[in-house]
Amino acid sequence: MKILAVGSIAFDTIKTPFVSGKNVLGGSLTYFSLAASHFAKIYPVGVVGRDFKPKHFKLYRKHNINSQGLTRAAGKTFSWSGQYDYDFNNRKTVYTHLNVFANFDPVLPTAYKSIPYLFLGNMDPQLQLNICRQTANPRLIVADTMNYWIERKRKELLRTLKLIDILIINDAETRQLAKEHNLYKAARKIVSLMKPTRRGGSPTLIIKRGEYGLLMFTRKNWFSLPAFILEDVFDPTGAGDAFAGGFVGFLSRQKHLNEKSFRKATMYGTIMASFCVEQLGPKKLITLKRRQIQERFKKFKKLFALI
């Protein structure tokens, strides 16, 4: 199966209490694509600078990621630097240099427009809208956003919500978008702003809660899933996009897209995020084997067996 993904590619400088690195390959496209590539062929659309080396393109191709949709522009690749303390929920952004990403205005290649699964990474909601309008009735559209866009591009974001099937955000962003402190009420409000899917099913909101797992809401039901507990966590960068990669990747292989398959997909998303945080940047996702994913899924599944 094929997945179209649109978002950022970056060079990250990361510092945690346990690991650090400079110019680490990152961005939403990198984490999403590496995670999803274990399930499907990935067709990313993004922009990089002249400092993006042939070895980086080679890495993508090695992992079932088609690099033909990546534009190489004059200038430097988007770069970001962040620091974490022992509470990984508190992150300090040292700098953000958009560079070539500042002028990113994606035009989908003709062959990409009919790809049935679309992931919209964290970016300007107007760009997300433009991308949706270029596609030819995809089977599933999943989007991410953040507090910056909720605050500055609210109208555009609300229009985007009416075109997507699933929104993935964290609890603070849920409250901010809904303008409601109670998380349950906030989730219900956001789902009510979304239109029924092209399949006639309920729109879905997934709320990421880090070490506390996630909540999934449809118009009728809700579902809670814990995180996969790890002894060692070294770097949470990209975990949300790795979750999305596992989630969409699993769904791309399913005959039926419904609440049951969505729930199982959240388990695979959680598994991919758990691998991501075990090493600096995307290192673990790069070396990960399908066998390891299935072994961890079986362990995770046992948590829900009645004793």
Q: How would you describe each model-predicted region?
A:
Residues 1-4:
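Extreme N-terminal starter segment of soluble prokaryotic enzymes
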Residues 11-23, 38-119, 133-138, 294-307:
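Conserved N-terminal subdomain of the carbohydrate kinase-like
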Residues 27-37, 132:
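Histidine-anchored nucleotide/phosphate-binding helix
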Residues 34, 80-83, 213-217:
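Short beta-strand scaffold segments in enzyme catalytic cores
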Residues 36, 170, 240:
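Short, conserved phosphate/pyrophosphate- and ester-handling motifs at nucleotide-, phospho-/glycolipid
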Residues 43, 228-299, 303:
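Conserved post-catalytic alpha-helical subdomain immediately downstream of the catalytic base
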Residues 55-56, 127-134, 155-159:
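A short acidic, amphipathic alpha-helical/loop segment
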Residues 137-140, 147-224:
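Conserved phosphate/ATP/ADP-binding segment of small-molecule kinases
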